[in-house]
C-alpha cells in the first residue's frame, strides 16, 4: 500500500495535491468537510487515495458516492491504476450488474442507491470510516436521501463517522453553514476556454441538426477531440445519422447510461496518435468522467428532466434548459489538457433567463421510493431527517397516500411486512409490489419480465402498438432463440430480478390477462375502464386517457396501463395489457345516492377501484339512517322543490320574516329558504321516516306537509305571538276571512278585498299590535284593483263617490249605496 507522500509524488501534476494534507487535517478535527475544485483537478481520484492514506485500515473503509454508474466505474479504475493495481484490490466499485470489491478493498466507489441499501441493512454503517459525496451539485433525490440518512447516522449513532462533500460548482456557503463544516478550495490549473455563442436560440426540435452543424464547423476550425452534449438518446442517434461518414476518418461515439460498459469504455478511451474523435453524450459526461484529448465542447443547452405531476400522480420526461452551473461544468471539459473552445447553442442575451443553479430533484420528484426507503430505515417522520432541502409537505402527503394504497406503510407511516419485502428490491414501489405479490413460478417470471420492460427504454419506439404483451412475447422469443440483440439489457435486468426473488426463467406463451393482472397489482390507480368512444378510457385515479383507435387494445372494456403520458385533458397510453374485471383488487362499498333521473333513492352494493365501478347489485335492507341522510342531502342540493313547496309555505315564511324584522328581540327561528335547506338534516328526518317506513321517492316526499313542518320549528309561545302580531287572515264586515299579504317588512301588509265586502268598515285594520296599518287594496266585483288606501274613513268621505260612479257604469246590476257606512256588506251580488 502506498504511503501519503508516495501518492502525492506520483500525482504531482494534479492541483489537489496542494490541498490533500489540509483535507486530512480538517477531517481529523471535524465531522464534515466541504471541498470545491474545478473539473480535472483530481478531487474524484487523488483525494480519496490521500484520505485513505491518512486512516488506518482498522478505522474502516471509505465509501465514495458517484451519481452515475459510468463515473463510478471510471473513477475506480483510475484510482486503481494510480496505485498500480486492478479494481477489486485496494479500490473497488459496486454498481448495478457489476461488483468489483474484495476483502482487501478500502475504497469502495458506489452509486447513491447502494449506500441507501447499506444504511437500511446496517444503520450504524459498521466498518465505514468516511463517506464522500462526489459531484454533490447534481442534487439528485437519491443523493439527498443518502446524505440525510448518513448525516442522521452520524448525529445519533456514529459521531466518529466522517462526511466529505465535493463538487466543482456547489453553493458552498449554505452547505457549510448547514453542516457547520470548514470549506477547502482548490483553484486548479484550468486552461482558458473560449466561449462562442449562437446568433439565435434553438428549440428542442432543432437540437440534433444544430449540434451536427456546430460540430462540422468546429471540426474544420480547431484541433482536438469534440465532446457534444445533447439531452437524450434519441437526439444522439439522430445527430449521429447526420454526421455519418461526413467527417471521416474522425470516429463518432455515443455516450449515455444505457450503453454496455464496453461501449462506454470505447467512448472515453484516448484517441490513437494522429486520430480524432467525436463523443455525443448526455449529461452523463458532465462530471467525474475524463475523456482525454477533448478541446472542443458543443453544448446544446438542454437536458432531459423527469417532471412529476402531483395532480395525476404521473411522471414524464421533458426537454428543458440547463442551468448556468451545468453550462460551466460542460465548458470546463474543453480546458482540461490545453486551451479549448466551447460552442454554446444559445445567445448571450438569453443567459439572464437561465437559472443560476439546478433545482434539487427532491423539490419536484415523486417521493414514494424515497419515503419507502425512509420507512425501511426505521424513520416514520420523513420531515425529521436532516435534509439540505426539505421535501414539500404536499409531495410527502401524496407519496404516503400511494404507499398506504400499495400496503407498504400503515396509517402511522411505519413499514409493513409487505413494504419491508418491497424495499429490498431496487425499483419503484409500484414495480416491487408486483414482484413481491407474484406467487406461482410463472407469475414471478412474468413479473420480472414486465419490470425489466418498464424500467428500460422501449425497444419498439417506432411501433405504434401499446400492447405490453407484444413486448413480452418478443423478449421471450429472443431468449429462446439466443438472439437477444436490442433485448439484451432488458433480459439482463429481468435475470437480475429473478435472482432477487428466486424465480426461474420462463419463455412460454403468456395469457394477456395474466400480464394485465400483474400490472394492475403494480399500478392500481391505472386500472382503466372504457368510456364514451372506442379508445377512450378513465383511470381509477380519475384521469382520462386514450389509446390509438387502431390498437388491438382499443376495444377492450378494461385495461391495466403500465406507461402513459400525463396530460391535463387526456393522457396517451404507451403500454397496457387487457384486464379481467374479476382480477381487479377492489373495495366493496354500499352506495346510497339520490338518482335525479328516476326521482328517488338508489341503493347499490358496488365493487370499486378508485373512481371506477367494476360491478354493482341492488342493495336490500340498507341502513335507514343512511337513506334518510341521502334524502336530506338531495333536498339540500336540489332545493325545496323536491317537497310540497306551496304558496302557503311562502306566505308563512313572509309572516315570520316580517315579525322577526319588527321584533328582533324575539329571536325567532330563521325560516328563510337558505337556512331551511342548510339545516334540513336537523328537522326533515322526522317527516321522512314514519311508522318504520322511509320515504325514498320524490312522489312520496311531496306528501309531506311542509307548511306544518316549518311552522313546527317555531316554539308554541312564539307561534301565538306570530299569530297575534301578524295574523294570516283578517275578517272584514262581510264576514269573510281575507288573507293578508306580508311583503317586505319595510312595506305595509296588503289586504286585497272586494269593495262591497267592506261596506260599514269605519277604521282601517292594523297588525303588529295596532302599530302598523294595513294597505287596503279595494277590488271591483271582477277582482280588479280600484283603490289603494290606508285610511278607510277618508276613502268613504271622499274618493268613494268617484269610484262609485265608475263602478255603477261598469257594474250596473250591483248595489252601490250612497251611504256605504250604513250599507250591508255582501260577499256575492246584491241587486239594486
Predicted features along the sequence, with ranges:
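Short conserved micro-motifs at the rims of enzyme active sites and ligand-binding pockets
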Residues: 120-121, 204, 309, 354-357, ...
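Phosphate-centric recognition/catalysis
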Residues: 749-754, 760
